[in-house]
Amino acid sequence: PIEDVVVQTEFSPTLWCVPATIDVAAVEIDLINAADRESRLRLALREYLQGLEEKGQPKIDYVLIDCPPSLGIMTINAFVAAGEGLIPMQAEYYALEGLALLTRSINRIAEIHNPGLDVSMIALTMFDKRTTLAREVESEVRTYFPRATLDTKIPRSVRVAEAPSFGSPVVFWDPRCTGAVAYKQLAREIALRGAPSQAVTEEA
């Protein structure tokens, strides 16, 4: 159960986390022949959120599911559980090809398991406005996903890359660096957009 592993973070009293461990690597194998293997995460989240409501605890506004860079059973579980998809994308050529593949996969998962799923937001990351490639990639993404592509772009930043080695999000470790400022602006933009898709607790 999620309630057995969820922890309150040191960064905010309203920010909770379900941390991953090395044991996650075995999940792909464990779920190969499991019943409802694509829906395990959705069921676990529904149980946890309903439990909070029954106990009269504060409602969780957002559930963010961080996915591995693959289309394995873990990622499929995340898409089946999600109400909408936010895709962070590096402003590079191969990332553009990967975006096309990912969106097709998401559409397929939506058809079979989660009709309410959609790519509602795309965030450009590691963006270097000095390069022609980055600007061309941005133009392509905005052409094909004009409504989903967010205005805020995350620039390349050494401080962002360094922050994990200090065990802290960059917005706490160096809140004034360009990367931290951009991430805070991105969070505001996402919050203002709201969550128009179905809630994770609804039936797909």
Question: Can you describe what each PLM-predicted range is?
Answer:
Residues P1-A204:
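P-loop NTP-binding core
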